[in-house]
Design a protein with these regions (language model features):
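Short S/T/G/P-rich N-terminal loop/turn motif that feeds into the first structured element of a domain
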Residues: 1-78, 82-102
Length: 102
């Protein structure tokens, strides 16, 4: 069963969209290093202007293994601190979903 993790953020007033995307690219490198398939989305309908950082895994066990590695990686913590300090976005929501085969 596949797993997807999504982090939705809203740009803060006055934030540079290019800087937001660059920060997401840095995060994507870390997630990919630990096995995630990363994509980045701009919301066009509904919560227009928000961004979605999405990470897919082939299975729940692959997701769990990646999370263990991410939490132990100093690069993850450094990137999180950099992201918070930059103040470019505000967290909207996070989701972790498992695929239902139909």
């Amino acid at each position: 069963m596949a797993v997807v993790v999504q982090y939705v953020v809203k740009p803060n007033s006055g934030s540079d969209p290019a800087a937001i995307i660059e920060m997401a690219k840095e995060g994507a490198v870390i997630w990919r290093k630990h096995g995630g398939k990363v994509s980045y989305w701009s919301v066009a309908v509904g919560e227009v202007g928000n961004f979605v950082f999405s990470v897919n895994f082939e299975s729940f066990s692959a997701y769990g293994a990646a999370m263990e590695k991410l939490n132990a990686d100093p690069a993850t913590h450094a990137w999180q601190a950099k992201r918070w300090k930059a103040g470019l976005t505000t967290w909207v929501r996070s989701n972790m979903a498992t695929e239902i085969l139909i």
